[in-house]
Amino acid sequence: MEATQADTIRKGPISRFLESLKIIQFMLFPNRTNPAALYDLLSTTNNLAEESLYLNLGYWKDASTYDQACQAMAAAVGDFADLTDAPLQVLDAGCGFGDQDEFWQRHYNNCAFTAMNICASQIAKARQRFPNSKVTYVEGSATAMEFPDNHFDRVIALESAFHFNTREDFFKEAYRVLKPGGILCLADVVGKDVELNWKMRIALYLGQGLWQAPKANDYSWSVYQNKLSANGFDGIETEDISPHVFLPFKRYANQRVLDPEVNSRINPILRKLWTMPHGGFEPSSYLLIKAVKKNQ
């Protein structure tokens, strides 16, 4: 039976204190290469979802709840990746607790989905939640994959590539494991070519620390596009969906943390972060990105 937020175990005061110290450590110290530790900390407790265990920012164009928005994001990425009912081999790099993969498997039943995550606890939880799943859940690194060359028709990274150490190393691995003509599709947070004021710089520093985003991944779309091209991809397409992501998410989060059930289980530091002004997202765009592996 699928686990939901209703099954979440509340943390005691000692666990909560240690968790708070870890959050502060993430934000203030420059080691930004351990996303598994971050997601172990987030676990199923520090999550805004109503029933699911989604962890993305959501696509809020027609959504009113977090679960709806996150599923809409999964649907948008599936469409942008040209998923079809054909028997495609699909890799999801950074699968979280598996919600998006189960959604895709239901809608593209003939595809074979492999869901990979560096966070062992999330893979274990996904297997527990979906014991009869057709999705194959694998623990592993997106920058050092244990898959053969030319194996997948699609490689997807839904709001995960900014964690990878580095994103460009992931591009290289995605190119290797994709078949010629295969598609790499990302939903990613990409820096803008803008001058940052001191408030933006502080917010960016703390945000990169909290979300374990390596400094090497902090670059604009022009650099991003060049890195894709340099690693063998062409046919690059983008869609900027920022207006339907950042501000609507923050508005929802501001209200969501007022719910007594959510308030009781989310770490107080994270509650404060969810209610902070929108400014932390100002130097970034939220892009859907698609690139094709050149035929060899």
Residue ranges of predicted features:
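Conserved alpha-helix/loop element of class I SAM-dependent methyltransferases that forms part
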Residues: 67-86
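A short acidic, Gly/Pro-enriched loop at the edge of an enzyme's catalytic core
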Residues: 143-155
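Short, glycine-/aromatic-enriched active-site segment of Class I SAM-dependent methyltransferases
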Residues: 190-214
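Short alpha-helix
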Residues: 215-232
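N-terminal auxiliary segments of SAM/dcSAM-dependent transferases
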Residues: 2-46
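Class I SAM-dependent methyltransferase SAM/SAH-binding core
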Residues: 91-144
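Conserved Class I S-adenosyl-L-methionine
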Residues: 12, 237-296
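A short glycine-rich, Lys/Arg-flanked "PGG" loop and its adjoining helix->strand segment in the class I
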Residues: 168-183
